[in-house]
Amino acid sequence: KGESLRDTVETISAMGVDGIVVRHRAAGAPHRVAEWVDAAVINAGDGWHQHPTQSLLDLYTAREHLGDLDGKHIAIVGDIKHSRVARSNALAFATMGAKVTLVAPKTLLPTHLEGWPVTVTHNLDEVVDDLNICYLLRMQLERQTDAVVPSLREFHTEYGLDVRRADRLGDALIMHPGPMNRGVEIDPNVA
């Protein structure tokens, strides 16, 4: 309705709140909000940048099921390029001692992975037998401007979790931040 982000959060801060939870389409918005107010700021997702609150939930879930993550192998599979969850989780899981592998076609990987504590493969079948967690990401179709895969069917064939791959995972934890694209990253018979 025309009010700037700064005006909104300064008004909320003037009410004496202890904290403000910010989810914004612009990368870095929570950082800016923290400069404007004298309250704790929680980043609930900013643009393509980060999603630390999702990461905290994922760390909690992983530790509840697996205990210590040190030495565990975690694959983050799918649309890494457009996923703020991938960025946050790669760092969080690696910080906890896990080996993190990104699995995606080149067109769905960020162009600059320097500094990411990960290895990269373009073949899910190379790592699926060795995983403790298979973390699937949805295709962020709304954030894509070009055709990044030949088809969703081909993406599913190469990178989707089908019954055969799910069986190969054994007791590994299957995770997804939602919402999922049924039949794209996860086969309907696995979901």
Place the predicted regions along the sequence by residue.
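Glycine-rich phosphate/diphosphate-binding loop of Rossmann-like nucleotide-binding domains
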Residues: K1, E64-L137
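Phosphate/diphosphate ligand-binding glycine-rich loop within oxidoreductases
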Residues: K1-R63, N181-R182
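Structural alpha-helical scaffold elements that stabilize or flank donor/cofactor-binding regions
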Residues: S13, V33, E126-V127, V190
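Short, structured coil segments at secondary-structure junctions
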Residues: G16, W36-D38, M96, E114-W116, ...
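Rossmann-like adenosine-cofactor binding region
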Residues: L113-P188
